[in-house]
Amino acid sequence: MNKILVEVSVGELLDKISILEIKQDKIKDVNKLEFIKSEHSILKDQLEKKVQSNSQLEKLFNSLKEINAKLWVIEDDKRQCEKDKDFGEKFIKLSRDVHFLNDDRAKIKLEINNLTGSKIKEIKEYTSY
């Protein structure tokens, strides 16, 4: 299989690494974990080679990972609501929480990109609420 090499923002790279770390904690299937660990190793290696780490970047990474961990739980809870055909107040709250957390996630990724001088920046624009 051919490799596809694509430049990404530092925020996107850290976001992906944080998600892979959460997957390593949550997923139990050994075959899936093998792929997850391999991808994590590749991305972490590139991060260490290309990005100068500091305490502020580590703090932002930890915030990003915390948000992604919350999103993981919320998505599991939403799937349980789907299974139970329960689309009441709990489902609505969970759905709203997703977009609030994703807004926070986008802000942190932009802050990471600004801090690291990333040439690529994920720009978002949403309807105000």
Predicted regions and their residues:
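Extended, charge-rich alpha-helical interface modules
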Residues: 1-129
